[in-house]
Amino acid sequence: SFKLALVGLNGFEDYYPAEISGGMRKRAALARAMALDPDILFFDEPSAGLDPISSARLDDLILQLRDSLGATIVMVTHELASIFAISDHCIYLDVDTKRITAEGHPKELAESADDERVREFLRRHATPLVKTK
């Protein structure tokens, strides 16, 4: 019940997953992952399937939990907003060689990664989705 309260689900202890929203299911999964007070929390595309507002809220929740519980966060994601909001250290893997091509802070890598593909990927974050005149 305490872990559910941490993720904003106090009062939903008796609900089934089908009875709550997608964002609430993600938060319930996070509470379940925290049940044994791990030192490391692993996330695999945590905001997949969420709308941008719910994704941002989940990012904020992950940061709050990291800070309050002192847990290390390891996350696999393609969501640029999440990378820049949560990450203080990133590792990029080459899809062909399966080797690390860059690692460091995402803002620094966006500017100066040796691998141009890493720079291009991270710079998409600053590119508007709709071009204006």
Tell where the protein language model's regions lie, with residue ranges:
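Conserved ABC ATPase signature
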Residues: Y16-I20, M24
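Conserved ABC ATPase "signature" region
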Residues: S1-F12
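A short, proline-enriched helix->beta-strand linker immediately N-terminal to the Walker B motif
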Residues: A35-D39
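Conserved beta-strand-loop-alpha-helix hinge in the C-terminal portion
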Residues: D96-L122
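Helix N-cap at the start of a conserved alpha-helix in ABC-type nucleotide-binding domains
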Residues: P52-S54
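Helical segment within the ABC ATPase nucleotide-binding domain
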Residues: A56-S68
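Catalytic Walker B motif of ABC-type/P-loop ATPase nucleotide-binding domains
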Residues: L41-D44
